Amino acid sequence: MSKINIRNEKKSDSTCISEVITLAFKDDPHGDGREAEIVELMREDSALTISLVAEVDNKIVGHIAFSKVTVNDEFIDWYGLAPVSITPSYQSQGLGSRLIEEGLKLLQQLNAKGCVLLGEPDYYQRFGFAADEKLILPAVPAEYFQALSFGGSTPGGIVKYHPAFG
């Protein structure tokens, strides 16, 4: 594979990002077809704390977003990772891992206390994520809702993402 460039998104990237997200989730049995719309709504609301793209040969082929979450309706410096998207022809080549690692590093530089996500435990455990019974995302199987604390204790309570998630 050619050189990979990970960078912050630019305003001019939004159409390409939407295309990448749509392609990435097109055949995903857990996707609902709204992933690109969710990112766009968060962008319009200035709610994307971190939004990174992965480029190969100056073409955007991956994207990741991080946004604030609340625990028991209070923002306590925890963030949600959602979504991470890689164009299908570039999947399974380490781009998702690179985006996740870079995003988590940037969150820590922002003095975040932790990050949550909804995803496959077998994939995300390599980054340190694990289910934690103290954090609850209603109507979701507990083993798929995972947390990563950046050093402190994990809070307890009901987690809410940005309203764009529905």
Which stretches of residues belong to each language-model region?
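Active-site rim helix/loop that mediates acceptor-substrate recognition in acyltransferases
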Residues: 18, 25-56, 61-65
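A short acidic/small-residue loop/turn micro-motif
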Residues: 68-70
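Short coil/loop residues immediately preceding or within conserved phosphate-binding loops
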Residues: 49, 76, 112
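Conserved acetyl-CoA-binding loop-helix of GNAT-fold acetyltransferases
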Residues: 86, 92-105, 117
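Conserved acetyl-CoA binding element of GNAT-fold acetyltransferases
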Residues: 75-88
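Conserved active-site alpha-helix within GNAT-family acetyltransferase domains
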Residues: 109-113, 118-142
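A short beta-loop-alpha structural element at the N-terminal edge
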Residues: 4-17
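C-terminal "cap" of GNAT-fold acetyltransferases
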Residues: 116, 137-166
